[in-house]
Swiss-Prot record:
InterPro entries per record: LIPOR_BchN/ChlN (IPR050293), Nase/OxRdtase_comp1 (IPR000510), Protochl_reductN (IPR005970)
Organism from which the protein derives: Pinus contorta
Localisation: Plastid, Chloroplast
Protein name, per record: Light-independent protochlorophyllide reductase subunit N
Lineage: Eukaryota, Viridiplantae, Streptophyta, Embryophyta, Tracheophyta
Pfam families hit by this protein: Oxidored_nitro (PF00148)
Needed co-factor(s): [4Fe-4S] cluster
Length: 459
């Protein structure tokens, strides 16, 4: 089955199955982003082993997440789920005093039909702490969609837009009749409707993107998620929202339908080309002409010249894992690489429409063939295609890395792109560092001429 998106870009769907990292791993970066939160994963021992081993954090470090481990009594309905969770949440409130507790549902809670959404409102009223329920099970969601479900639930708790657009400055003067020292050094922003950016990024990346928009006289009203639960941005009619990650389609839908926000459909700020396109898409919405972006982008490309010489002409194959494959592929094509195939667990064609258009534009600019995009790819079919194509690099899940490496194909874990800082102008070098590491390693091994190092007559 194939569906045409734009000219010469076709989507294929092979199996309908997900082959990706577990979505409950979103806990690893969200608990660090939302500083006053506590994540409670409701699952089995397997989920606990995964969180402890895959995330590399020992329970003795007392991170702000924990496991509510399901036992045989829970599955056979011999235990009262509400009382068990209540005991845990009271202990969490006493020990950690979080501003919000987030329950993460897993595969097991789906299978036994545990009514987490039904228990949460009653329990949060009893203990006096907000409780959000996000289902991040691997049955329905791919790797990074765990964050998508959490942000979609959190969007429901965002306050409504308090002041009519254009009145907030006057209202502030009424609240604070004295001069505010902090505002003396601020940039004079253009008068535009509120803009909220959604997507979890480290604080330094948030500052970088805020700064880039500030240079265009655009003020970011808030981020979803915020560093503190109490600082969630106000949402409502007249508020514009824009995403920074390709896997947040559910959050975007919630913001449009439930909170009545206006979505700015833009490419994602990954790579200098994507960051420039992201800003250029936001500026016209507020009647602002983007300035100096071309010079900034050219300067970044010039600084990447040593990497570009290494990757130019090399081929890459995306097996699909974290839903940011199209953005990474577009950036690598702009760097001069040949992308044979883009496997992706799930693709929302409306949310990624601008990214797909930029992919096509980039391929035409670089005189490259537009890569095949395969949604929910069949791994067996992919392996056969890779044997025929013989790519220099495969960006894949961890399960396939070693077998592919044994067959002479350079590999890079897709999970590394998820945890690395790849957004904005300044971090394009980090993306290329990840990509070129296996290429450099293979070249160094070839230069060693390994066959001459083995003694034929070893006595």
């Amino acid at each position: 089955m194939s569906t045409k998106i734009v000219e010469t870009i076709t989507l294929e769907c092979e199996t309908g199955n997900y082959h990706s990292f577990c979505p409950i791993s979103c806990v690893s970066w969200l608990y660090q982003k939302i500083e006053d939160s506590f994540f409670l994963v409701v699952g089995t021992k397997t989920c606990g082993y995964f969180l402890q081993n895959a995330l590399g954090v020992m329970i003795f470090a007392e991170p702000r997440y924990a496991m509510a481990e399901l036992e045989e009594g829970d599955i056979s309905a011999h235990l009262n789920d509400y009382e068990e969770l209540k005991t845990l949440c009271i202990r969490i409130r006493k020990d950690r005093d979080p501003s919000v507790i987030i329950w993460i549902g897993t595969c097991t809670t789906e299978i036994i039909k545990m009514d987490l959404e039904g228990m949460a409102p009653k329990l949060e009223y009893e203990i006096g702490v907000p409780i959000l329920v996000a289902r991040a099970n691997g049955l329905d969601y791919a790797f990074t969609q765990g964050e998508d479900t959490v942000l979609a639930v959190m969007a429901h708790r965002c306050p409504d837009q308090e002041f009519p657009i254009g009145e907030s400055k006057e209202t502030k003067k009424k609240l604070f009749p004295f001069p505010l020292l902090k505002e003396n050094n601020l940039v004079e922003y253009a008068n535009h409707p509120p803009l909220v950016i959604f997507g979890s990024l480290p604080s330094n990346l948030v500052s970088q993107l805020d700064t880039e928009l500030r240079r265009q006289f655009i003020k970011v009203s808030g981020w979803l998620p915020a560093q503190r639960y109490a600082d969630l941005p106000s949402l409502g009619d007249g508020v514009y929202v824009c995403g920074v990650n390709p896997f947040l389609s559910r959050t975007a839908t919630t913001l449009i339908r439930r909170k009545k926000c206006e979505l700015i459909v833009a490419p994602f700020p990954i790579g200098p080309d994507g960051t420039r396109a992201w800003i250029e898409r936001i500026c016209p919405v507020f009647g602002i002409e983007a300035q100096s972006l071309e010079e900034i982008e050219e300067r970044i490309w010039e600084s990447l010249k040593d990497y570009l010489d290494l990757v130019r002409g090399k081929s890459v194959f995306f097996m699909g894992d974290n839903l940011i494959e199209i953005s990474i592929a577009r950036f690598l094509i702009r760097c001069g690489m040949i992308v044979y195939e883009i496997g992706i667990p799930y693709l929302d064609k409306r949310y990624q429409a601008a990214e797909l258009a930029l992919l096509k534009k980039t391929c035409i600019r670089m005189c490259m063939p537009i890569p095949r995009i395969v949604e929910k790819p069949d791994n067996s079919n992919q392996i056969r295609r890779m044997r025929e194509l013989k790519p220099d690099l495969a960006i894949t899940g961890m399960a396939h890395a070693n077998p592919l490496g044994a067959r002479g194909i350079g590999t890079k874990w897709s999970v590394e792109f998820t945890f690395a800082q790849i957004h904005g102008f300044a971090n394009a070098r980090d993306v290329l560092e990840l990509v070129t590491r296996p290429l450099r390693r293979n070249e160094n091994l070839d230069n060693l001429d390994r066959t001459t190092l083995v003694r034929k007559n070893n006595k």
